[in-house]
Amino acid sequence: MTLTFKKSDGGKADSGLGTARSGDCVIRAIAIAEQQGYRKTKAGLNDLLHEMTGGLQRSCNDGTPLPVSHKYLTDRGYVLTLTKGTYLCDNDFTGRTVIACIPRHNMAIVNGQVLDTWDSRKSRRTKCGSPKLEGFYEKVSN
């Protein structure tokens, strides 16, 4: 299955937070996968960041630390699947909603379609042209 791409900011512009580029890929990916507002997702991650750092850090504006995003997702029923040695194009995400983790970036994939602000399906760092897939989060239904 070939992944397709659709540009999406996860509702950031609609939330009145502008369109400036910032390290907000985790916020955007979670907002899309959870089908909740960007502002609500950002507030939840900021609260967790503040709690986990004892107040030393207050905002995920310039990137969300991995322990914070991992806890946020696992607390909401997501399970991490590690995919060592595979590439994004090696996986079939048809009929699934996942948050894919590639080097230095996270993206939402809904039914085989990457929803992101840029076409993150491509990489110039690999021979196959697809980024390495470190793992992905998928919600487990109870």
Question: What are the language-model segments listed below?
Answer:
Residues M1-C60, R76:
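Active-site nucleophile-adjacent alpha helix/oxyanion-hole segment immediately C-terminal to the catalytic cysteine
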Residues A13-D14, Q57-R58, L66, K132, ...:
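Polar low-complexity intrinsically disordered regions enriched in Ser/Thr and small residues
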Residues M1-D14, K84-L88, F93, K132:
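Contiguous, function-dense segments enriched for cysteine-driven chemistry
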Residues T4, K71, G135-F136:
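Intrinsic disorder/low-structure terminal segments
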Residues E51-R104, V110-G112, D116-D119:
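Conserved active-site-adjacent core of cysteine acyl-enzyme catalytic domains
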Residues D116-N142:
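Noncatalytic regulatory segments and standalone regulatory/sensor domains
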Residues A33-E34, T41, N106-A108, K132, ...:
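Functionally constrained cores in energy, signaling, and assembly domains
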